[in-house]
Amino acid sequence: VSSSIDTADNPFVRVREENNVLLVALTSNRGLCGGFNNNVIKKTKKLVSEYGESSVAVFPVGKKANDAFKNSTYLATDNLPQNSASLWDDLNFENVNSLTEELMSSYKNGDFDKIIVVYNSFKNAAVQIIKSEQLLPIVKADSDSENTDNTDYIFEPSQEEIIVDLIPNSLKVTFYKAMLDSLASEHGARMTA
């Protein structure tokens, strides 16, 4: 179904030249969890060097990322909340939702051309996998080459109305999942440290 929907006019799908990239680094507020925080910080610094300091901004979520990047020249300070570490104190969808809306607004307004989330993905209590996942622009799913089904779908309400609601909600859930993955990974890393 997703391959039959035209999303070209949606601002969250439109690919732009990558002049300003935002890296959202998810770390914890506390230490004593092995390499959990350090892995995110190292991966973020690697991405900064790949994109170039002049075209990157880092938005830290968590005290450890904030401490690591507070004196850097590429710390994101405009149009984003400054006390993002408090999200971990009461992690719920509503709190993450407001941050995600600000990220989407910054992208939609052209402040950033690409937003990447760097976090630890939970595999099990002993293993956390460092991930850098593109949040915006949305990457269109590859259509299966074997699936050549040319079914004509009828949408109620219209495609445009569905997309206007579906894409922002999908982005909110994707970012919330990254936050939950990071929290579960932190607890696993703390147990095995």
Where on the chain are the PLM-derived regions?
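C-terminal beta-strand-loop-alpha-helix "lid" module of Rossmann-like NAD(P)-dependent dehydrogenases
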Residues: V1-A193
